[in-house]
Regions:
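Hydrophobic, well-ordered beta-alpha structural blocks that scaffold small-molecule cofactor pockets
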Residues: 1-110
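Short, surface-exposed basic-aromatic patches at helix termini and helix-loop junctions that form
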Residues: 21-22, 78-80, 287-291, 317, ...
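Short, polar loop motifs at secondary-structure junctions
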Residues: 31-38, 67-69, 200, 276-280, ...
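Short, charged, surface-exposed secondary-structure boundary motifs
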Residues: 37-43, 94-101, 303-310, 349, ...
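Active-site regions of enzymes building and remodeling cell-envelope glycoconjugates
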Residues: 42-51, 78-85, 170, 209-225, ...
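Electropositive, gly/pro-rich neighborhoods at or near active sites that engage anionic ligands
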Residues: 100-289, 401-402
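A mid-sequence, solvent-exposed acidic-amphipathic segment
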Residues: 277-322
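C-terminal functional extensions of proteins
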Residues: 335-403
C-alpha cells in the first residue's frame, strides 16, 4: 500500500482524491500553507497539515493538486523531497499506479492544450490578418456548372497529402505519379474545369466546433504553408466541401440548398457513375431519382490508381458524349474528371455526396455506418451486403477489378 500526501487543500484536492485508487494507496494527509485550512476537517477523516508537519515522515509519493504547480514543485525539491516522489496531477507522469482514471484525464488535458495551439496557429487566417486563397461557396459553384456545363475537380486533404508524398486516405497508397498528376490538375487554367479546394483557412463560424478543430489540427505545422505554396494567390477557387454539405455544418441550411442544386445538375440527363465497389451512389435513397437514366462502372474500392489506365479506357469506350459523368473514387477521381474534361466530356468529382445525403435524410448527428455502403471514415466492420440488388446490378455496365 502506497503512503501518499496531497499538496493543496483547494478546489482540485477533491478531484485528486476521487481519482486515487484506494486499493493501492492510502492518503495520510492534505498539505496546505494556508493556516486557516490547517487543522480542519475539510476532507472528512483526512487531516489538513502545514508543510513542516511532514518533515522527517516516511511516504511514497507527494501529489501536487494545485494548477500553478511550478513554484510548489520547486519548493518541494528544495526542501529535500526527491523528485521521483513528486507527482504533479496536471502533468504526464511515468507512474500512474496510484490513480484509477488519470490516463484518460491527462489525455483530455493534452488534447485541450493542443486545441489551443491549433486555434492560435489558425487565428491569423480566420481573422483575415494573413491572406487566404479566394474560395467561392459551393452553391455558387453548382449554379455555375448548371449554367455552363463545366467540369469539377476537387482537392481535399487526401489529394494534398498525395502531392506532399504522405499517407492520408486508407483507400489509396502514396504514388509519385499520382501526386504529379494531381499537381498538373491543380495548376490547370482550362476554363471548362473548376478547381475546388477545401475552405480550411477562414469562415469557420459555420462549422461545428469539432469539425473546425479537426481542420485546424490538420492545417497545423507545415501543412498550411505547404498547401499555400501550391496555390495561386490570384486565382479563384471553389469550395471542395460542396460534396460534404451536411455533417460538418452547425445547421442544415447549407445542405438544404446544396442537395437540390446537385440534383438539378443531373435532372433529365443520362448519368454515368464511376465509383468504387460498395459506394453504391443513389442506392437506397432518391439522390439520383431525377436522372433520366443511371449506369455504373465499378472500380476497385482500394488503390484504384493502380488500374487507372484501364478505368480511363473503359470510360472512354462506354460513355455517351452527352452523359453527365459523376465520379467517386478518392484522389483518382480528381485526375479522371480532368482527363475526361480535356476530352470534351462533362465530368464531376462528387466525392462523398451520397454518404452525406444518407445522413442528411436520416437526420444523423455523427458519421455512422450506412448498411450496404462503404463509408470512408469508418473502414472497419461495415455491413456491405445489399438487400435489394436487382436494379443496382442492371445499372452496372462494366467492372474493373483490383489486384
Amino acid at each position: 500500500m502506497f503512503q501518499i500526501y496531497i499538496w493543496g487543500a483547494g478546489f482540485y484536492a477533491k478531484q485528486v482524491l476521487g481519482e486515487i485508487d484506494d486499493s493501492k494507496a492510502e492518503v495520510l494527509g492534505i498539505i496546505d500553507s494556508d493556516r486557516k485550512k490547517q487543522g480542519t476537517k475539510l476532507f472528512d477523516t483526512i487531516p489538513v497539515l502545514c508543510p513542516s508537519d511532514i518533515s522527517g515522515r516516511r511516504f511514497d509519493y507527494l501529489i501536487i493538486s494545485v494548477r500553478n504547480y511550478g513554484p510548489v514543485e520547486e519548493a518541494c525539491i528544495e526542501s529535500g523531497i526527491p523528485s521521483e516522489k513528486i507527482i504533479v496531477y496536471w502533468k504526464e507522469s511515468p507512474d500512474n499506479s496510484v490513480f484509477k482514471k488519470r490516463a484518460e484525464r491527462v489525455e483530455g488535458l493534452i488534447w485541450e492544450k493542443q486545441v489551443c495551439q491549433y486555434r492560435l496557429d489558425s487565428a491569423p487566417y480566420e481573422w483575415s490578418l494573413k491572406p487566404s486563397p479566394k474560395i467561392w461557396e459551393g452553391a455558387e459553384l453548382l449554379k455555375k456548372i448548371a449554367q455552363d456545363h463545366s467540369s469539377l475537380c476537387r482537392f481535399g486533404d487526401g489529394e494534398f497529402e498525395m502531392i506532399r508524398g504522405k499517407v492520408r486516405p486508407w483507400f489509396q497508397k502514396p504514388d509519385i505519379t499520382l501526386g504529379e498528376r494531381l499537381k498538373e490538375v491543380l495548376c490547370s487554367d482550362d476554363v471548362r474545369i473548376n478547381i475546388a479546394i477545401p475552405q480550411n483557412f477562414c469562415g469557420f463560424d459555420k462549422y461545428k466546433e469539432d469539425a473546425a478543430d479537426n481542420i485546424r489540427r490538420y492545417m497545423f505545422g507545415n501543412t498550411r504553408t505547404d498547401i499555400l505554396a501550391l496555390l495561386d494567390k490570384d486565382r479563384l477557387y471553389y469550395d471542395a466541401y460542396v460534396s460534404r454539405p451536411y455533417m460538418m455544418y452547425k445547421d442544415g441550411k447549407n445542405a438544404d440548398e446544396i442537395f437540390p442544386l446537385f440534383q438539378k445538375l443531373w435532372k433529365d440527363r443520362d448519368v454515368l457513375i464511376i465509383e468504387g465497389e460498395y459506394s453504391r451512389i443513389g442506392i437506397g435513397n432518391d439522390l439520383m431519382a431525377k436522372a433520366r437514366s443511371v449506369s455504373r462502372i465499378l472500380c476497385p474500392f482500394k488503390n484504384a490508381w493502380d488500374k487507372y489506365e484501364n478505368i480511363l479506357n473503359t470510360v472512354l469506350e462506354k460513355a455517351n458524349r452527352e452523359a453527365l459523368i459523376c465520379i467517386s473514387l478518392g484522389p483518382c477521381a480528381t485526375v479522371l474528371a480532368y482527363d475526361l474534361a480535356k476530352r470534351g466530356y462533362q465530368a464531376l468529382d462528387i466525392g462523398q455526396i451520397d454518404n452525406e445525403y444518407d445522413w442528411y435524410m436520416q437526420g444523423a448527428k455523427v458519421r455512422e455506418d450506412i448498411p450496404g455502403k462503404l463509408v470512408a471514415e469508418r473502414p472497419a466492420g461495415q455491413n456491405l451486403e445489399l438487400d435489394e440488388e436487382i436494379d443496382y446490378q442492371k445499372q452496372i455496365i462494366a467492372r474493373i477489378r483490383g489486384n
